[in-house]
């Protein structure tokens, strides 16, 4: 369980950690958080022997798994894997929990069927080379622009410009 807080104030991460600690196991604690916290909460939980990766129960925020010959990795953006020498394996499904250890990846909780992915992943948050749910961010942005151009083809427009990347 979790030993201490960073200060006299509680932040969201520490609150989730304390809620996980209320379970009799990491899985029970994650289930408790996923079923009682309003909103989306995907997480990675580090233990002495494993990393648990849990995607929020509606699949709004992504987590994917990568692999190389030395082991596994997980992240919210699979585009980071190539720079680290890993290849993409798969996305976690809504509510899915996996345990990654030296022995491999083990499914702890299977994915649910209800998915409500955040569309801002493709429109705003995602790095252009990232892929979410099998759809490339840059391609989605170009296709969205093309669809808007077709929709507004009969309007007299002087100029159209994309929204610059943020951050």
Give the positions of each predicted feature.
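Conserved short alpha-helical segments that host acidic/polar catalytic motifs at enzyme active sites
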Residues: 1-94, 99-164
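Carboxylate/His-rich catalytic cores and anion/metal-binding grooves
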Residues: 167
């Amino acid at each position: 369980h979790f030993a201490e807080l960073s200060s006299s104030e509680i932040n969201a991460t520490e609150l989730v950690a304390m809620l996980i600690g209320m379970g009799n196991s990491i899985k029970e604690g994650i289930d408790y958080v996923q079923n009682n916290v309003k909103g989306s909460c995907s997480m990675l939980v580090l233990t002495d022997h494993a990393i648990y990766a849990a995607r929020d129960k509606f699949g709004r925020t992504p987590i994917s798994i990568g692999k190389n010959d030395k082991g596994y990795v997980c992240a919210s953006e699979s585009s980071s894997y190539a720079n680290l020498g890993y290849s993409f394996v798969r996305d976690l499904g809504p509510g899915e929990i996996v345990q990654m250890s030296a022995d491999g990846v083990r499914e702890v909780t299977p994915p649910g069927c209800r998915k409500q992915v955040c569309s801002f992943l493709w429109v705003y948050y995602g790095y252009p080379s990232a892929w979410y749910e099998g759809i490339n961010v840059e391609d989605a942005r170009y296709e969205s622009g093309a669809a808007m151009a077709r929709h507004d083809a009969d309007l007299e427009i002087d100029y159209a410009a994309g929204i610059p990347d943020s951050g």
